[in-house]
Regions:
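Polyanion-engaging groove/track-forming segments
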Residues: 1-458
Length: 458
């Protein structure tokens, strides 16, 4: 019985394809890549901070990300640092930082992602990687010189597939008084159209969606409620993990381990539903807030906080509160014993998890769908944090917490949703998609064409 199957098509995103090629060279243990590893994003940030601190310790943290982005831009454009003229002091600073950064990478046998791509290009040229008979490109608006060079070296036949577009006579322009009015009109229009025909696909493109995410979400929700329309809405913009309720509560609890916290941070924890404080009565928490405010302090240590909120007179309320706050009371000794030491990043990850459990995180009640996804993302965040063990160093609490907070700020939480009739998208997310009806917000000269971001170091 002879049976045949189709071979799986080799369809890749550009990053996936380049990673596949790099893995192929690594599997061969080819001389081009032997003994080399690609530096990860968090490792890179650490090395940039160290490289900048050698010249300017005061600004090492604030310039690390922009220095990394600058190097990425140069390497994507196939430019070396020597090709950048020394016309400004910023360029001179960057060149010194880069020299220190390269020394750190070389010492640890690491390369940047773009340098790994350059080695992939050499792999195609020397025959270590087999060429494809043809490569078809689809959906590329522009390709940086480095990836374009690699693609051309991977095949003698490279063609771009063009999207077929049809002219639309139903396009019209609407002028509004201001941006808020246009967002409200777009939301009402989408809700009305879905009420008339629920199975159509409608898109609203907002160029700066990340800057007005909460406003758009509120207006769309109000419009759908007004029309009595129940439909799934997909908003493509994500939220920084540090700003999600569950992760923010976890970081706030871990922050207790630091010497002092502001009154606002303590009150945020006091009323959080994601920790043991939620088991306290509303009256107790209200009295606790008033007692803390009466002290006229701007910040509190853990001992000062507990002294301020626990009633001094014996009562049933005091006994009930002491029972709930016992893990926090015991923490005074625990924190002194445990936080003064140096640990690996995985050691701190285990410590943080060990600490959060008795603090009642993420709360007693069952998590809803969004909160459950945030909990899963937290676990992934901790895994990324543990990957910093590759640095081969041990750090104190403040450094460990700084890296964890940094990861949480840079990681984006976007809860997965099914294909929704109403899609709220940014410009990049909306490119190439098809809709039955589409509203593009803010079609004026300030948004189209998009302004070029100027690199302050170049």
């Amino acid at each position: 019985d002879e049976r045949s199957v189709w071979q799986a098509p080799r369809v890749f995103s550009i990053d996936h394809w380049l990673r596949f090629c790099w893995d192929e060279l690594q599997d061969q243990n080819h001389r081009l890549v032997s003994g080399l590893s690609v530096v990860g994003p968090q490792q890179s940030r650490y090395y940039w901070e160290k490289a900048i601190a050698k010249e300017d310790a005061e600004h090492s943290t604030s310039y690390a990300k922009i220095a990394g982005d600058t190097l990425k831009t140069l390497q994507n454009c196939n430019l070396s640092i020597d090709q950048v003229p020394d016309e400004t002091p910023a360029v001179e600073f960057f060149k010194r930082w880069l020299h220190n950064f390269n020394e750190l990478l070389e010492r640890n046998h690491l390369i940047t992602q773009q340098q790994s791509w350059q080695l992939i290009e050499q792999g195609f040229k020397c025959g270590a990687l087999p060429q494809d008979s043809a490569i078809l490109l689809y959906g590329f608006q522009s390709t940086p010189p480095l990836p374009a060079t690699i693609i051309n070296s991977a095949s003698s036949s490279v063609n771009t597939l063009q999207t077929v577009t049809k002219s639309n006579d139903n396009t019209f322009r609407l002028e509004t008084q201001d941006r808020h009015q246009e967002l409200r009109l777009a939301s009402s229009w989408a809700a009305q159209q879905l009420a008339i025909k629920p199975d159509q696909r409608i898109g609203i493109v907002v160029p700066d969606l990340n800057n007005c995410l909460h406003q758009v979400s509120r207006l769309v929700g109000e419009a759908l409620k007004t029309q009595g329309t129940e439909t799934v809405v997909n908003i493509s913009a994500g939220t920084a993990m540090a700003d999600t309720a569950l992760v923010n509560a976890a970081l706030g609890l871990i922050g207790i381990l630091q010497h002092k916290r502001s009154l606002q941070e303590w009150l945020q924890l006091l009323y959080s539903p994601y920790c043991a404080f939620n088991q306290l009565s509303v009256q107790f928490r209200t009295d606790a807030e008033l007692a803390l405010r009466k002290t006229r302090r701007f910040d509190f240590t853990l001992e000062q906080f507990l002294s301020g909120i626990i009633p001094h007179q014996e009562s049933e309320q005091r006994e009930a509160a002491l029972l709930i706050l016992q893990p926090l009371i015991e923490l005074k000794t625990f924190a002194r014993l445990k936080t003064g030491s140096q640990k690996s990043f995985s050691g701190w990850a285990a410590f943080f998890n060990q600490f959060l459990e008795p603090m009642g995180w993420p709360g007693k009640r069952q998590l809803n769908s969004i909160e459950y996804q945030q909990r899963q993302h937290w676990n992934s965040l901790i895994e990324q944090f543990c990957s910093l063990d590759n640095l081969g160093i041990e750090v104190g609490l403040s450094t460990a917490l700084k890296h964890l907070q940094q990861l949480a700020r840079e990681s984006v939480f976007h809860p997965p949703t099914a294909d929704a009739p109403l899609q709220i998208l940014g410009l990049l997310e909306g490119a190439g998609l098809r809709f039955d009806q589409l509203w593009i917000v803010g079609m004026h000269s300030q948004n189209f064409p998009a302004s070029v971001a100027i690199n302050p170091l170049l």
